[in-house]
A protein has these predicted regions:
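Enriched for short, Lys/Arg-rich terminal
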Residues: 1-7, 54-84
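Amphipathic alpha-helical interaction segments
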Residues: 15, 36, 50, 72-74
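Intrinsically disordered, low-complexity regions enriched in small/polar residues
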Residues: 9, 30, 44, 66-67
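Low-complexity, intrinsically disordered/propeptide-like segments
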Residues: 19-22, 35, 66
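A generic "cationic amphipathic patch" detector
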Residues: 25, 45, 76-77
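A short, surface-exposed loop/turn module that caps and links secondary-structure elements
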Residues: 30-56
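Arg/Lys-rich, positively charged N-terminal/basic patches that mediate binding to nucleic acids
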Residues: 1-30
Length: 84
C-alpha cells in the first residue's frame, strides 16, 4: 500500500518547528500519511466546498483537508488553542 503524501504549508511548518512538545503533532502527521481517512474532532467546509478537518492535540489544533484525487493531505495550519 502506498503512503499518502502529506503536504505541510510553510507557516504551519514554522509553527511546528517552534513547538517545545511536538511529538504528538508529528505522530499525528505520520498517522495521516499511513491512513488519510482520519477525520478531525471538528469539520467545516471552506468557501471552495472542501471539508476542513480540525484535530485537537493538547494545546494545538491542526487544520487539514484530504484531496483523494491527488492522494494528498494538506496541513493548512497549526494553531495554539486555549482552554476557556
Amino acid at each position: 500500500m502506498n503512503n499518502t503524501l502529506v503536504y505541510i504549508h510553510s507557516h504551519a511548518c514554522d509553527h511546528l518547528r517552534g513547538l517545545a512538545n511536538r511529538e504528538d503533532v508529528i505522530r499525528f502527521i505520520n498517522q495521516l500519511e499511513s491512513n488519510p481517512e482520519i477525520i478531525g474532532d471538528y469539520r467545516q467546509p471552506d468557501p471552495r466546498g472542501r471539508m476542513i478537518e480540525v484535530k485537537l492535540l493538547g494545546r494545538q489544533a491542526i487544520l487539514f483537508f484530504r484531496d483523494p484525487y491527488a492522494n494528498i493531505v494538506k496541513i493548512l495550519d497549526i494553531r495554539n488553542v486555549e482552554a476557556g
